[in-house]
């Protein structure tokens, strides 16, 4: 919500500075996002009148003007296309200071003397108009300072409202809050009822009363929309970031900003018969005011006449029924549309309007008539015309209602950590428009007004008290409770410790969205039906992720595009597998790695990370809870991974994750020009460990044997190690694969595996005969089962 400070102070004016007001609003939960001046920093600019113009003798696009400041006449050379006799414009006289530290001096343009400058909006930083001079009203007093005339010593305050505070999406709502914060009186403008000057009405039929419980319409005849919108209204709209269009549209926008009630003006000549508020027919077409043609769905509420749809209710009007400069009769609409009926409709059609923004957050249903009278009065004042009677339809059973809320003093003390005097409680709540009745026993019965849709519980009232009293004034009271640590199996690992482990291995934690682009989902999961969101934030966040990889890879792209060549990230979060029926939400731990193996340094190379580097990180995670030997890595297939660099991770035969390099085709589609490795693990399987078994350290020496084995190239090293373990006996304490070789001196169909075996007995020294016998058993089993022999 953006508004002019001067406009706000016209409603309520606490005796505080702008800075204090802004700080107080933010502390009350209405966070001020920005404060911007209404105009640039300039001085010496007055209202000037162009008395005459003539062509510059040496320049086709320049004109020599005689300009009056009310007491003197000055010659000014100007190249603006709209300069003409009788025009009143901002006139920067000699010595004037313009934004950008630009000082006006006497000058010669193509040999003709110029004593000042006629200014555009952009040159004074009053809006963005740079296509000509800023035209002031014909009644602007010549010679008056422009800053004074336009009240430019003002600022636009932008408040970032939370979705539950739709009541503050208007100047009336903001004034109500400021009045409550400072115990200041709010001067709400009187809105008199406009008497009917004729009896013409258009019948209104509401066919969807649950979606539109209240609808008001009024015919206003003989308006002149060629008349300009008054400068004071244009300026208030500009300072609220609303562009002036024409008198009718400006008035409806102004009333919406002022009171919070969206309105719409139809060209009466384009309405066939009466008004029907109905649900759209499936496939019905409508060209909107922005020129976009939309195909309506049957769940969309529309305003229609007897032949076609005229507008999407609460979102945007249609082009063919919109008002133009030629419109002579208008039909004003002021309605209350249910939040649920409007919610998400604008986004579903790729739209976002001020009206939909308000209806989605809630509009006070009691505002409709006041807003209609206010808009009618302004329309008659600015454009002339004759107003007819208001026609209204009302479905009371579908209007929102809030039951009274009981507030207890005891509960206030409990939640805020302090007591608030009963009279102060009543004063604060009454200032917000709530009706408070005390029962004399430390309780109040509070009736909630129709504009506060966010108050329905006792805690909501206590929140209001805390806001108005001041969060910074609440005492610091530490909670006192008997807390018992949560019981947890000793063998179970915890996520924070796993995070610390990965950070220690050079990873950084990432947090990505659970909803992703459908195209990205298809790239990682071709042929899989995604879980679609009914009301997505945007089109590229429309499906739930079935893996953490898409978000991590997108984060990787973001970093690579910013010259971060070495990226190691992990994330823990939920993945969503299946559809709504039988949906599985599974906690996962995933990572992405790209770049060099080690950080840049003089003592280490710049070798790129490879599959086995990432596998080592995964093994560290799997072994964290003491159960590494329960996991196995087997060759696997995954549509997102390289067919030759993919490992499926299993635990007791169950699939618990994947590790591998991004598939080359996927990398190409994602614009990745370097190897990228990813892993993803089921968190519950990783965390499930084993209790360590402690035993006395042996005082006797270890015995080590290194074996160089020749095996077929397609034999997995893990198979060789499994056979060795089975035959190495109970005193084997360590088994390591420390070299793999293929090349000169080796059969091209074979490979050499070098393994180290270590034995140690807890109570005696092992002799060579025992170790040699065991080694021979190992070699015999390897040859029989895997055709693996000792290299000679």
Curated annotation (Swiss-Prot):
Cross-referenced Pfam families: B3_4, B5, FDX-ACB, tRNA_bind, tRNA_synthFbeta
Record note on quaternary structure: Tetramer of two alpha and two beta subunits.
Recorded GO CC terms: phenylalanine-tRNA ligase complex
Compartment(s) of residence: Cytoplasm
Catalytic activity: tRNA(Phe) + L-phenylalanine + ATP = L-phenylalanyl-tRNA(Phe) + AMP + diphosphate + H(+)
Cofactor descriptive note: Binds 2 magnesium ions per tetramer.
The protein's required cofactors: Mg(2+)
Main location: cytoplasm
Gene Ontology MF terms: ATP binding; magnesium ion binding; phenylalanine-tRNA ligase activity; tRNA binding
CDD domains xrefs: PheRS_beta_core, tRNA_bind_bactPheRS
Gene3D superfamilies: 3.30.56.10, Bira Bifunctional Protein, Domain 2, Ferrodoxin-fold anticodon-binding domain, Nucleic acid-binding proteins, Phenylalanyl-trna Synthetase, Chain B, domain 3
Protein name (Swiss-Prot/TrEMBL): Phenylalanine--tRNA ligase beta subunit
Domain tRNA-binding: 39-147
PROSITE patterns per UniProt: B5, FDX_ACB, TRBD
Domain FDX-ACB: 698-791
HAMAP family attached to this UniProt entry: Phe_tRNA_synth_beta1
InterPro entries: aa-tRNA-synth_II/BPL/LPL, B3/B4_tRNA-bd, DNA-bd_dom_put_sf, Fdx_antiC-bd, Fdx_antiC-bd_sf, NA-bd_OB-fold, Phe-tRNA-ligase_IIc_bsu, Phe-tRNA-ligase_IIc_bsu_bact
Binding site for Mg(2+): 454, 460, 463-464
EC number: 6.1.1.20
GO BP, one annotated term: phenylalanyl-tRNA aminoacylation
Keyword RNA-binding: yes
Key words of the record: Aminoacyl-tRNA synthetase, ATP-binding, Cytoplasm, Ligase, Magnesium, Metal-binding, Nucleotide-binding, Protein biosynthesis, RNA-binding, tRNA-binding
Keyword Transcription assigned: no
Broad EC category: ligase
Domain B5, first and last residues per copy: 400-476
């Amino acid at each position: 919500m953006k508004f002019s400070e001067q406009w706000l102070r016209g409603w309520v004016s606490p005796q505080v500075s702008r800075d204090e007001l802004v700080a107080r609003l933010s502390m009350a939960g209405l966070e001020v996002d920005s404060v911007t001046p209404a105009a640039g920093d300039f001085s010496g600019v007055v209202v000037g009148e162009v008395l005459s113009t003539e062509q510059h003798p040496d320049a086709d696009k320049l004109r020599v003007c005689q300009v009056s400041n009310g007491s003197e006449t000055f010659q000014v050379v100007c190249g603006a296309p709209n300069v003409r006799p009788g025009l009143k414009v901002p006139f920067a006289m000699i010595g004037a200071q313009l934004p950008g530290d630009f000082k006006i001096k006497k000058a010669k343009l193509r040999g003709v003397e110029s004593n000042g400058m006629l200014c555009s909006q952009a040159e004074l930083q009053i809006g963005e108009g740079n296509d000509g001079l800023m035209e002031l009203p014909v009644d602007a007093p010549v010679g008056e300072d422009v800053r004074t005339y336009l009240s430019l010593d003002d600022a636009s305050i932008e408040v970032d409202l939370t979705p539950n505070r739709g009541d503050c999406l208007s100047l009336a709502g903001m004034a109500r809050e400021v009045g409550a914060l400072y115990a200041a009186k709010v001067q709400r403008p009187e809105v008199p009822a406009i008497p009917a000057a004729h009896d013409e009405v258009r019948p209104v039929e509401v066919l969807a009363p649950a979606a539109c419980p209240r609808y008001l319409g009024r015919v206003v005849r003989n308006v002149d929309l060629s008349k300009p919108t008054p400068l004071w209204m244009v300026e208030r709209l500009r300072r609220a970031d609303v562009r002036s269009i024409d008198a009718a549209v400006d008035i409806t926008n102004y009333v919406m900003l002022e009171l919070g009630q969206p309105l719409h003006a139809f060209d009466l000549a384009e309405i066939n018969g009466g008004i029907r508020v109905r649900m759209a027919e499936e496939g019905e077409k409508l060209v909107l005011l922005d020129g976009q043609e939309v195909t309506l769905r049957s769940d969309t509420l529309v305003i229609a006449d007897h032949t076609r749809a005229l507008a999407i209710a609460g979102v945007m009007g249609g082009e063919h029924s919109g008002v133009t400069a030629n419109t002579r009769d208008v039909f004003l609409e002021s309605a209350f549309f249910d939040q649920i009926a409007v919610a998400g409709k604008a986004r579903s059609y790729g739209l976002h309007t001020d009206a939909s923004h308000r209806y989605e957050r809630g509009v006070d249903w009691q505002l409709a008539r006041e807003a209609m009278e206010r808009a009618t009065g302004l329309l008659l004042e600015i454009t002339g015309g004759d107003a007819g009677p208001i026609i209204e339809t009302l479905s009371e059973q579908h209007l929102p209602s809030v039951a009274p809320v009981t507030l207890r003093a005891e509960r206030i003390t409990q939640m805020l950590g302090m007591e608030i005097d009963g009279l102060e409680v009543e004063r604060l709540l009454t200032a917000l428009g709530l009706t408070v009745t005390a029962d004399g026993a430390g309780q109040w019965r509070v009736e909630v007004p129709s504009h506060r849709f966010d108050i329905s519980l006792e805690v909501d009232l206590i929140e209001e008290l805390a806001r108005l009293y001041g969060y910074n004034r609440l005492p610091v009271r530490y909670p006192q409770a008997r807390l018992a640590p949560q019981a947890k199996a000793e063998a179970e690992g915890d996520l924070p410790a796993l995070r610390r482990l990965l950070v220690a291995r050079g990873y950084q934690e990432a947090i990505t969205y659970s909803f992703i682009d459908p195209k990205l989902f298809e790239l990682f999961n071709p042929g899989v039906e995604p879980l679609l969101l009914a009301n997505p934030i945007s089109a590229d966040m429309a499906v739930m992720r079935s893996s953490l990889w898409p978000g991590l890879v997108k984060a990787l792209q973001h970093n690579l595009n910013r010259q971060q060549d070495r990226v190691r990230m992990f994330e823990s979060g939920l993945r969503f597998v299946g559809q709504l029926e039988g949906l599985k939400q599974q906690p996962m731990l995933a990572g992405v790695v790209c770049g060099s193996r080690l950080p840049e340094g003089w003592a280490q190379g710049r070798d790129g990370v490879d599959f086995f580097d990432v596998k080592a990180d995964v093994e560290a995670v799997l072994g964290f809870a003491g159960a590494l030997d329960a996991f196995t890595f087997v060759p696997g297939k995954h549509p997102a991974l390289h067919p030759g660099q993919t490992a499926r991770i299993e635990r007791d035969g169950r699939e618990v994750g994947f590790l591998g390099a991004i598939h080359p085709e996927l990398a190409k589609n994602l614009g990745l020009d370097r190897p990228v490795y990813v892993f993803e693990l089921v968190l519950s399987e990783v965390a499930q460990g084993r209790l360590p078994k402690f035993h006395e350290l042996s005082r006797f020496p270890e015995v080590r044997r290194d074996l160089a084995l020749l095996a077929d190239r397609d034999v997995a090293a893990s198979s060789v190690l499994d056979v060795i373990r089975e035959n190495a006996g109970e005193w084997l304490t360590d088994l390591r694969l420390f070299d793999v070789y293929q090349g000169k001196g080796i059969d091209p169909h074979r490979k050499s595996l070098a393994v180290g075996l270590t034995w140690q007995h807890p109570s005696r020294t092992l002799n060579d005969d025992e170790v040699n016998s065991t080694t021979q058993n190992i070699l015999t089993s390897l040859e029989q089962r895997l055709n693996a022999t000792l290299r000679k």
